[in-house]
Swiss-Prot record:
InterPro entries: DHFR-like_dom_sf (IPR024072), DHFR-TS (IPR012262), DHFR_CS (IPR017925), DHFR_dom (IPR001796), Thymidate_synth/dCMP_Mease (IPR045097), Thymidate_synth/dCMP_Mease_dom (IPR023451), Thymidate_synth/dCMP_Mease_sf (IPR036926), Thymidylate_synthase (IPR000398). GO terms for biological process: dTMP biosynthetic process; methylation; one-carbon metabolic process; tetrahydrofolate biosynthetic process. DUMP binds at residues 231, 377, 395-399, 407, 437-439. Keywords: Methyltransferase, Multifunctional enzyme, NADP, Nucleotide biosynthesis, One-carbon metabolism, Oxidoreductase, Transferase. This is Putative bifunctional dihydrofolate reductase-thymidylate synthase. It catalyses: (6S)-5,6,7,8-tetrahydrofolate + NADP(+) = 7,8-dihydrofolate + NADPH + H(+); dUMP + (6R)-5,10-methylene-5,6,7,8-tetrahydrofolate = 7,8-dihydrofolate + dTMP. The keyword Cell membrane does not apply. SUPFAM superfamilies: Dihydrofolate reductase-like (SSF53597), Thymidylate synthase/dCMP hydroxymethylase (SSF55831).
Length: 494
């Protein structure tokens, strides 16, 4: 990775400098400051009017006895990186310095990246091709994992984003299993982070974890939501008109403050894509998320007495693949009947990517009374920009405890799948919610969940050979490093 040219930064990005300043100046304790450690050449590359870097303890590494720092305040001279870290660990620095940042140059960064004391790496990822003559090695992803990645921005014609990686294993040895195989991971059950608490991150970075969008929304609903009755008789607290946005470029938004049933998310989405409305197909795979709405008792209670148990009616998959076809039962052959919205979406993305009508809708008013449950996540629009595919989904009714973690993952997964089919990269998933509600019976469980600190989101790997939306099977998908907190039980309101 290039970091310099002719002893200076090879790009002019005010946003990059602001990010650097914000992350190295900001402290949680206002009585403390951070230390920035740099080599002599890095110090000399800073314009005279800006050095020493204000609001920080400047630690300069040099073996030159003739080095003159003009008796500047907030400047300390050390002969090596080790001696600098030892000094900062002693009084008075250990009492006044909150965090230590290694900021350059190239050789010092190369020493630091794999050092056991390196807890996190914060970098600006430049996506444009820019000539450099100073480099650092790539991030070792066997030890570090993305925590936060900003949405890409373009400044002075240069596309870039800000990324923070956290150490999740203590050493290279611990990033391997007993057989020596690297745990960068197909089997997420085997991968446990050696580091469990990530509060060592700067507060501004720690709180940018995208899971906080969900946690903060749940907290806001519980504290400030309107108390309402609902069709299940359970009662809710709710808010109207909410939005969350997730970045799909580096990791996958599967919540970590509780274990989300990933296999259920995956199998349900493949079931939707197949056009099936038979809940027994999922039951046979050990997926019981639709059992409550497919039972004999429930179908009878909503007047579908003639409907076979397990037959959900013309729900999501049917509308995606056969919109407008006459629904009879879950056993009928609907091939070639109705309008295949999913294939239409894919065709438009491939052949008319600027179309503003790339829509997938499960809301069909003429079929609502035939459905075991009218669509909650009902409308998705896709958007193509600079080789990336983004999706915005509208959800009329959102069960924040049980449904929303599933919905975030499901539509993020759908976006990633369609992107691959269309030779694009995943961009954003935007989740827009009408009635965002917490069932009163879920409040205690959600309060437990809100006490948990997020862990890094996993990374999703999809079999790159698959280019047909109907060809995907469960073995085509692998989660890398999903290590959530334990499962939190919540009972579904039916």
């Amino acid at each position: 990775m290039g970091i310099g040219k002719d002893g200076t930064l090879p790009w002019k990005l005010p946003g990059d400098l602001k990010f650097f300043k914000d992350i190295t100046v900001t402290t949680s304790d206002p009585s403390k400051k951070n230390a920035v450690v740099m080599g002599r050449k890095t110090w000399e590359s800073i314009p005279l009017k800006f050095r020493p870097l204000p609001g920080r303890l400047n630690v300069i590494l040099t073996r030159s006895g003739s080095f003159d720092f003009a008796t500047a305040e907030n400047v300390v001279i050390c002969g090596s990186l080790d001696s600098a870290l030892q000094l900062l660990a002693t009084t008075p620095y250990c009492l006044t310095v909150e965090k230590t940042f290694i900021i350059g140059g190239g050789e010092i960064l190369r020493q630091s990246l794999n050092a056991p004391a390196c807890e996190a790496i914060h970098l600006t990822d430049i996506e444009s091709s820019i000539e450099c003559d100073t480099f650092i090695p790539p991030i070792d992803l066997s030890m570090f994992h993305p925590w936060y990645s900003s949405f890409p921005v373009v400044e002075n014609g240069i596309k870039h984003s800000f990324i923070s990686f956290v150490r999740v294993t203590k050493s290279i040895a611990e990033a391997n299993d007993s057989s020596g195989k690297e745990l960068t991971g197909n089997d997420s059950k085997k991968v446990k982070f050696e580091i469990e608490n990530f509060s060592f991150l700067p507060k501004m970075i720690f709180e940018r974890h995208e899971e906080y969008q969900y946690l903060n929304l749940v907290q806001d609903i519980i504290r400030n939501g309107a108390k309402k009755n609902d069709r299940t008789g359970t009662g809710t607290v709710s808010k109207f008109g909410c939005q969350m946005r997730f970045n799909l470029r580096r990791n996958f938004p599967l919540l970590t403050t509780k274990r989300v049933f990933w296999r259920g998310v995956l199998e349900e989405l493949l079931w939707f894509i197949s056009g099936s409305t038979n809940a027994k197909v999922l039951q046979e795979k050990g997926i019981h998320i639709w059992d409550g709405n497919a039972s004999r008792q429930y179908l009878d209670s909503i007047g579908l007495t003639q409907r076979e148990e397990g037959d959900l009616g013309p729900v999501y998959g049917f509308q995606w693949r056969h919109f407008g076809a006459e629904y009879t039962d879950m056993h009928a052959d609907y091939v070639g009947k109705g309008f295949d919205q999913l294939m239409d979406v894919i065709d438009k993305i491939k052949n008319n990517p600027d179309d503003r009508r790339i829509i997938l809708s499960a809301w069909n008013p003429t079929d609502l009374k035939k459905m075991a449950l009218p669509p909650c996540h009902m409308f998705a629009q896709f958007y193509v920009e600079n080789g990336e595919l983004s999706c915005q989904m509208y959800q009329r009714s959102a069960d924040m405890g049980l449904g929303v973690p599933f919905n975030i993952a499901s539509y993020s997964l759908l976006t990633c799948m369609i992107a691959q089919v269309c030779d694009l990269s995943p961009g954003d998933f935007v989740h827009v919610i009408g009635d965002a509600h917490v069932y009163r019976t879920h409040v205690e469980a959600l309060e437990e969940q809100m006490r948990k600190q997020p862990k890094p989101f996993p990374i999703l790997k999809i079999n790159p050979v698959k280019k047909d939306i109907d060809s995907f099977v469960t073995s085509d998908f692998k989660l890398v490093r999903y290590d959530p907190h334990h499962k939190i039980e919540m009972k579904m309101a039916v």
